[in-house]
Regions:
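Glycine-rich phosphate-binding loops at beta-strand->alpha-helix junctions
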Residues: 225-233
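Glycine-enriched loop-and-adjacent helix/strand subsegments that border the catalytic/binding cleft
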Residues: 66-76, 80-215
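Short glycine-rich phosphate-binding loop at a beta-alpha junction
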Residues: 79, 219-224
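Short acidic/polar active-site loop segments enriched in Thr and Asp
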Residues: 76, 218, 253
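Active-site-flanking structural segment that lines cofactor/substrate pockets
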Residues: 34-71
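Single conserved hydrophobic/aromatic residue that forms the stacking wall/gate
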Residues: 1-6, 11-12
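Feature captures the RNA virus RNA-dependent RNA polymerase
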Residues: 19-34, 38, 191-192, 199-200, ...
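Divalent-metal-activated hydrolytic enzyme cores
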Residues: 162, 168-171, 199, 203, ...
């Protein structure tokens, strides 16, 4: 991680460089991560017997993943990503979902590498389109070594756990999409109506499920994808998740929507609980 880091991020950088186990895990994840471009991946599904448990919780993403991973399950966590900047605003102290994942794990060091800049981030920058596309990056065996809380706390090494992370960007519906966390996202709001947005999300969320299924995930940790900084309407997003997951209820053991919220900001959780709970 670069020079713009505040104290906690500097500690993460130093820890990942100095601890052999973390260095080795970063290298292994980099060697085995897969970029699924927009039209890649056929609909491969291994059917299981019972229907998946579908859960809506108020947890943070890694907080939700921890008990499954600790029990030996193959867990895939969706990263609500910046399409144009590795880790979003993590190096500047921002605190959305992607930044939280990067602060607690080795993920940033899998995203911020030359081949991913060339194949994932720079092509999105050249699009200059805040709707982005369906590209997904699947990173196996990311090591979570901090507790996923507002101020992440280092876990004892025996409690570190691996998760797979699926990186994908929701459409950026901000009035002014371009900022330091999302460079080259365009300076005008996306021209899209609710029907078009629904179709776009159906394609993108469908791709997320396909990739996770193709990679053999047993537990899928999702959430209010794009409903925070990217301003997607939670009712539309939750409805699309409900539609798409119907085809995957016998593919995963558990699908958990981890919709973290504060006491003041409960809309996303309330909507997801109403639609999917």
């Amino acid at each position: 991680i670069g020079s713009g880091l505040v104290g906690s991020e500097m500690c993460i950088r130093d820890r990942c460089r100095k601890i052999e186990r973390l260095r080795d895990c970063i290298k292994e994840s980099n060697n085995n991560q897969t970029l699924y471009l927009e039209k890649d991946v056929s609909d491969i599904k291994t059917q299981r017997g019972d229907a998946a448990d579908v859960i809506v919780s108020g947890k943070r993403s890694f907080e939700a993943a921890a008990p499954y991973a600790s029990a030996g399950k193959k867990v895939c966590v969706l990263n609500f990503a910046s399409a144009t900047n590795p880790g979003g605003g993590v190096v500047n102290g921002s605190s959305a979902q992607e930044e939280a994942l990067c602060r607690c794990s080795t993920l940033y060091f899998n995203l911020n590498i030359p081949c991913m800049m060339d194949k994932f981030y720079n092509p999105h920058r050249k699009m200059n389109n805040p709707l982005y596309n369906d590209d997904c990056l699947y990173t196996p065996k990311v090591i979570v070594f901090k507790k996923d809380v507002l101020f992440p706390e280092l876990l004892p090494e025996k409690e570190w756990y691996p998760v797979d992370v699926l990186t994908c960007a929701a459409p950026n519906l901000r009035r002014y999409p371009n900022n330091f966390m999302n460079p080259n996202a365009g300076d005008k709001p996306a021209a899209i109506d609710e029907h078009q947005l629904t179709e776009l999300l159906r394609s993108r969320i469908g791709k997320i499920f396909k990739v996770a299924a193709n990679e053999g995930a047993e537990v899928l940790i999702l959430g209010a994808f794009g409903c925070g900084a990217f301003c997607n309407p939670p009712q539309v997003v939750a409805n699309v998740f409900k539609q798409v997951q119907q085809d995957y209820l016998h593919v995963f053991d558990t699908i958990e929507y981890a919709v973290f919220h504060t006491e003041r900001e409960t809309e996303n959780y309330r909507v997801f609980k109403s639609v999917l709970g």
